[in-house]
Amino acid sequence: MAAAFSSTVGAPASTPTNFLGKKLKKQVTSAVNYHGKSSNINRFKVMAKELDEGKQTDQDRWKGLAYDISDDQQDITRGKGFVDSLFQAPTGDGTHEAVLSSYEYLSQGLRTYDFDNTMGGFYIAPAFMDKLVVHISKNFMTLPNIKVPLILGIWGGKGQGKSFQCELVFAKMGINPIMMSAGELESGNAGEPAKLIRQRYREAADIIKKGKMCCLFINDLDAGAGRMGGTTQYTVNNQMVNATLMNIADNPTNVQLPGMYNKEDNPRVPIIVTGNDFSTLYAPLIRDGRMEKFYWAPTRDDRVGVCKGIFRTDNVPDEDIVKIVDSFPGQSIDFFGALRARVYDDEVRKWVSDTGVENIGKRLVNSREGPPEFEQPKMTIEKLMEYGYMLVKEQENVKRVQLAEQYLSEAALGDANSDAMKTGSFYGQGAQQAGNLPVPEGCTDPVAKNFDPTARSDDGSCLYTF
């Protein structure tokens, strides 16, 4: 008995019509020519009817597409219920708000920039911002027959805000730079710093390749690659750092890692370096074709503008800020930040006395209460001037005493306390600040007849022979 079987070739399609839509019609043909043979098996093919917007019903889930003019970003919940929740963005997060006005969309979904010289309430010097923005922009442009220096060297006095001003400009331009410091320009392994510079450069190039502006930012280049006199040793790594930066400046689109070579060009990455004295660097590195140099010396207006940003939350009047800046003309901008920090010393001292010295560690490091919170101290011009003169006096002590020379020339401590003795701040004052400790009184003048070497506070009983 022959086995019975049926073939599915030429059989009608088993796809349900509901899957293809409710408004689709079926056409039946009487005869189909199939592989040269005539077949009378019924066949159908699916055809979409012409769209008639007037005949659409509420049952059609895509009815709104015919006349939809909304923005997809603002109407993001259109597919709610039809898309797996795994692929739905969380509501209330940026542009995923269900209802957004055009202003909200611009402010949350798009990054917009203003063209003033402030960032987050901080002042950016116009000359500084101009130099940095122009240099970065030029390196991303194709200028006809122009060789643009790859490196911008910003140098000047200590504490003048070079690094901080750079960070403000980067933030204003929407740049997240690849950072390096002078401490990474030396290593126990020969060649490591030069390799690291190339790696960081290529990391920045990869970010640019992905469509986001980036740059390489090296802090205090002269401290890591410069020669500071006879006390510093010039190593192979110093030579290779200078040579690597020179090579990158000459071939910015062909930066290769050691041990490999890739013919594909990498994007050009502008390099920003800061320092205090570029005369310590290798001279061919700082020539004009490779490095564009910018000497940063803030003017009085720049100093006032930066100080307004420092004291912006302290309600210090502008005229008082101007008076403080004019009272300390030879100080760096960093001096005024340290001056503001000194005002909080009184608050911290009061907190320490209330907490107890033995409980400071438990309260600050291992406490459920969290760090202490202070009320903002009132900053008056008198208090700021007082602390300012204290800082200046400490600076003068460092310059005047110079204990290092005495330590190198003498085996013992020597006359390390002679300066304090001459100024009258050695005897008595340190012991009197300790609170209720017993202070032996007596004559503390070595010239007096009844000089008492054990006395720590002068009681006015000194006798002199004339």
Swiss-Prot record:
PANTHER family reported in the protein's UniProt record: PTHR32429, RIBULOSE BISPHOSPHATE CARBOXYLASE_OXYGENASE ACTIVASE, CHLOROPLASTIC
Keyword Chloroplast part of the UniProt annotation: yes
Similarity annotation: Belongs to the RuBisCO activase family.
Chain spans, region Disordered: 429-454
Disulfide bonds: none
Annotated organism of origin: Oryza sativa subsp. japonica
A Pfam family matched in the record: AAA
Gene Ontology molecular function, alphabetical: ATP binding; ATP hydrolysis activity; ribulose-1,5-bisphosphate carboxylase/oxygenase activator activity
Protein's UniProt name: Ribulose bisphosphate carboxylase/oxygenase activase, chloroplastic
InterPro entries associated with the record: ATPase_AAA_core, P-loop_NTPase, RCA-like, RuBisCO_activase_AAA_helical
Residues involved in ATP binding: 156-163
Function as written in the Swiss-Prot or TrEMBL entry: Activation of RuBisCO (ribulose-1,5-bisphosphate carboxylase/oxygenase; EC 4.1.1.39) involves the ATP-dependent carboxylation of the epsilon-amino group of lysine leading to a carbamate structure.
UniProt entry keywords in alphabetical sequence: ATP-binding, Chloroplast, Nucleotide-binding, Plastid, Transit peptide
Gene that encodes it: RCA
Cytoplasm recorded as keyword: no
Gene3D superfamilies tied to this protein: 1.10.8.1070, P-loop containing nucleotide triphosphate hydrolases
Entry GO terms, CC: chloroplast stroma
Cellular compartments annotated: Plastid, Chloroplast stroma
Transit peptide region: 1-48
Superkingdom classification of source: Eukaryota
